[in-house]
């Protein structure tokens, strides 16, 4: 297995964190227009295995 240079590792970490950040931002903006009770119930279903709907 080729050893990654510190720069490559940093680049990979940066891209991964950037992707996660983008996903979080998109989720946030998609959920914002909803009413707060809807948001609460949505988060509850998401926690209780509602993730299946997203994949």
Curated annotation (Swiss-Prot):
Annotated source species: Albinaria caerulea (Land snail)
Signal peptide, first to last residue: none
Record keyword Membrane present: yes
Subunit structure of this chain's protein: F-type ATPases have 2 components, CF(1) - the catalytic core - and CF(0) - the membrane proton channel.
Described purpose of this protein according to its UniProt entry: Mitochondrial membrane ATP synthase (F(1)F(0) ATP synthase or Complex V) produces ATP from ADP in the presence of a proton gradient across the membrane which is generated by electron transport complexes of the respiratory chain. F-type ATPases consist of two structural domains, F(1) - containing the extramembraneous catalytic core and F(0) - containing the membrane proton channel, linked together by a central stalk and a peripheral stalk. During catalysis, ATP synthesis in the catalytic domain of F(1) is coupled via a rotary mechanism of the central stalk subunits to proton translocation.
Gene, per the UniProt record: MT-ATP8
Protein name: ATP synthase protein 8
UniProt entry keywords in alphabetical sequence: ATP synthesis, CF(0), Hydrogen ion transport, Ion transport, Membrane, Mitochondrion, Transmembrane, Transmembrane helix, Transport
GO biological process: one example: proton transmembrane transport
GO (cellular component) term, any one: proton-transporting ATP synthase complex
UniProt similarity note: Belongs to the ATPase protein 8 family.
Intracellular or extracellular location(s): Mitochondrion membrane
Transmembrane segments: 11-31
Membrane topology: Single-pass membrane protein
Domain of life: Eukaryota
């Amino acid at each position: 297995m080729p050893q990654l240079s510190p720069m490559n590792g940093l680049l990979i970490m940066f891209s991964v964190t950037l992707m996660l950040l983008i996903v979080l931002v998109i989720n946030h903006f998609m959920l914002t227009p909803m009413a707060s009770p809807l948001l609460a119930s949505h988060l509850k279903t998401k926690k209780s295995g509602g993730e299946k709907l997203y994949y």
